[in-house]
């Protein structure tokens, strides 16, 4: 394990980019790219200069700085890799198609960005150059169809924009995606998509019913029927960036009650916190499917505290008796609870009361101006109290550690582990997201916090899933292993692939071998092609 961690860190030190200092002016590819795009122009094709941004443009500079600010850890490492030769912000299918064809013709790598929330920056940074960023920010139309209770969502939209559009169309519909509104649907849906309604309705990916997609040859598939069930299966949880570019998703809307109930209850360590968290582990995945209670562990006032944060698809009058019967240890009261609409519950999870609904349209990254490192786990058996106490002790060693524990069960147990690439279903009690944040730009401070995270992860190994130790793709972690260029073998990639996908990884690699046998769409943790 130490060898793997040292290898990951050593690669990390030459990975990604300190954009403010790097220079790609020596690369001839940007002018060749523009020439290629112009050559492919036709009457329906807008002047490529209107959506292709060179390093000397204001759009490029502002875009680069905004992306780096999503995790300043990349700046602390003083990376020396090349910055993108161009940033492409297409508006149409044709512009996306032509961008891919020219990239392939010129040997230029592609990084496809939806919301830019990849924890390791793989949607906008690259170890290898030259590369472009294909930013789908202008591909975010949303069409709600209440007649058949579906929506077509452009891959560049955020889940906040989707929630907003649903709320403006209906008071009795919602969608089971994440609680962070600025996350892009392109990555969120294609990696699975946890959310507060997943116990009732499953992951976001479980509710995708169709898609439009373009492959490395520029071929556009306008439906799942055209692309085939294998590819459609792969992009709903297997990370679409390994296979091509999703243009849009068709999702199934779900019915929500006119009133839902939320609560947020803080418990300091002195108030029997350990025993209550231990009890939560035993019951959270077995509760009524309408009830989602997650636990957030953090430091407050120099001491460890937990926040029990919940969303119940129903009224207070039904929630309180349920809690008294199943989880009386928490001591929930009417005063702790608030009834609201489903869309207001999304606001409740993110902002203080009184924020306008339009706040959901803010595409800004929630972790702006922070440095952070994250990891994930899945827990199959309750962690004993002594194990929890070991976590609390370690939380006092750094300034801003966070651990979010989200329960599975319900619909998550009804869906088989091979129905989508996301395999972490029945048998898993809850997922853990670990994160440590800091603000000081200093290599020593960065090393301290990243080392702390890795030591906590090592400590947790006896309490979590094993063989393989599960991980969640949308909480990407390059410590698990990385590809070594275009020729990474399936056997080498299994090191990290089985962590994310279990036995589904082989099927993903076979699909990759059919749709992208030359491995054009690749990054440091993309699925390698397996030709059979």
From Swiss-Prot:
FAD-binding PCMH-type domain span: 80-256
Coiled-coil positions: none
Keywords: Cell wall, Disulfide bond, FAD, Flavoprotein, Glycoprotein, Nucleotide-binding, Oxidoreductase, Secreted, Signal
Glycosylation sites: 78, 272, 487
Cross-link entry 6-(S-cysteinyl)-8alpha-(pros-histidyl)-FAD (His-Cys), positions: 117-180
Enzyme class: oxidoreductase
PTM remark: The FAD cofactor is bound via a bicovalent 6-S-cysteinyl, 8alpha-N1-histidyl FAD linkage.
Subcellular location as annotated: Secreted, Cell wall
Keyword Phosphoprotein: no
InterPro entries per record: BBE (IPR012951), FAD-bd_PCMH (IPR016166), FAD-bd_PCMH-like_sf (IPR036318), FAD-bd_PCMH_sub1 (IPR016167), FAD-bd_PCMH_sub2 (IPR016169), Oxid_FAD_bind_N (IPR006094), Oxy_OxRdtase_FAD_BS (IPR006093)
GO cellular component: extracellular region; plant-type cell wall
Note describing how the cofactor binds: Binds 1 FAD per subunit in a bicovalent manner.
GO molecular function: FAD binding; oxidoreductase activity
PROSITE patterns: FAD_PCMH, OX2_COVAL_FAD
EC number: 1.1.1.-
Main location (coarse class): secreted
Cofactor: FAD
Highest taxon, organism lineage: Eukaryota
Signal peptide start-end: 1-22
Tissue spec: Accumulates in cell walls of etiolated hypocotyls.
UniProt-listed Gene3D superfamilies: 3.30.465.10, 3.40.462.20, Uridine Diphospho-n-acetylenolpyruvylglucosamine Reductase, domain 2
Protein family membership: Belongs to the oxygen-dependent FAD-linked oxidoreductase family.
Protein name per the record: Berberine bridge enzyme-like 23
């Amino acid at each position: 394990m130490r060898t793997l961690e040292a290898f990951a860190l050593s690669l990390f030190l030459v990975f990604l980019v300190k954009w403010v200092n790097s220079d790609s002016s020596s690369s001839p590819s940007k002018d060749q790219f523009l020439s290629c795009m112009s050559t492919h122009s036709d009457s329906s094709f807008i002047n490529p200069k209107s959506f292709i941004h060179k390093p000397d443009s204001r759009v490029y500079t502002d875009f680069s700085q905004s992306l780096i600010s999503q995790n300043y850890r990349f700046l602390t490492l003083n990376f020396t890799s090349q910055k993108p030769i161009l940033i492409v912000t297409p508006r149409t299918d044709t512009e996306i198609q032509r961008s891919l064809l020219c990239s392939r013709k010129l040997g230029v790598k592609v990084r496809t960005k939806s919301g830019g929330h990849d924890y390791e920056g793989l949607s906008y940074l690259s170890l290898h150059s030259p590369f472009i960023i294909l930013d789908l920010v202008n591909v975010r139309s949303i069409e709600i169809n209440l007649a058949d209770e579906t929506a077509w969502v452009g891959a560049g939209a955020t889940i906040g924009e989707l929630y907003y559009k649903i709320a403006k169309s209906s008071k009795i519909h919602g969608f089971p995606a994440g609680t962070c509104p600025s996350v892009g649907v392109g990555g969120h849906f294609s990696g699975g998509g946890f959310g507060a309604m997943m116990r009732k309705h499953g992951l976001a990916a479980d509710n995708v019913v169709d898609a439009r997609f373009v492959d490395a040859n520029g071929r556009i598939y306008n439906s799942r029927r055209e692309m085939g069930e294998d590819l459609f299966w792969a992009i709903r949880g297997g990370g679409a960036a390994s296979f091509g570019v999703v243009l849009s998703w068709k999702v199934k809307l779900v019915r929500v009650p006119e009133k839902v109930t939320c609560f947020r209850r803080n418990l300091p360590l002195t108030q029997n916190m350990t025993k209550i968290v231990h009890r939560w582990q035993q019951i959270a995945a077995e509760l009524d499917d309408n009830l989602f209670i997650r636990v957030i562990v953090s430091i407050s006032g120099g001491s460890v505290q937990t926040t029990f944060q919940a969303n119940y698809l129903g009224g207070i009058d039904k929630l309180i008796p349920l809690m008294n019967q199943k989880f009386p240890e928490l001591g929930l009261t009417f005063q702790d609870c608030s009834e609201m609409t489903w869309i207001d519950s999304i606001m409740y999870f993110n902002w203080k009361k009184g924020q306008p609904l339009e706040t959901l349209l803010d595409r800004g990254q929630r972790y702006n101006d922070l440095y952070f490192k994250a990891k994930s786990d899945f827990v199959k058996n309750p962690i004993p109290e002594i194990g929890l106490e070991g976590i609390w002790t370690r939380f006092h060693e750094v300034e801003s550690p966070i651990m979010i524990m989200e329960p599975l069960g319900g619909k998550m147990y009804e869906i088989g582990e091979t129905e989508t690439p996301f395999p972490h279903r029945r048998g898993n009690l809850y997922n853990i997201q670990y994160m440590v944040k800091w603000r000081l730009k200093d290599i020593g401070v960065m090393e301290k916090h990243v080392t702390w995270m890795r030591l906590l992860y090592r400590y947790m190994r006896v309490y979590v899933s094993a063989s393989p130790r599960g991980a969640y793709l949308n909480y990407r972690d390059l410590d698990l292993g990385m590809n070594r260029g275009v020729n990474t073998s399936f056997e080498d990639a299994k090191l990290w692939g089985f962590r994310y996908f279990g036995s589904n990884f082989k099927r993903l690699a076979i699909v990759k071998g059919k749709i992208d046998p030359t491995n054009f769409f690749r990054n440091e943790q993309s699925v390698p092609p397996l030709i059979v």
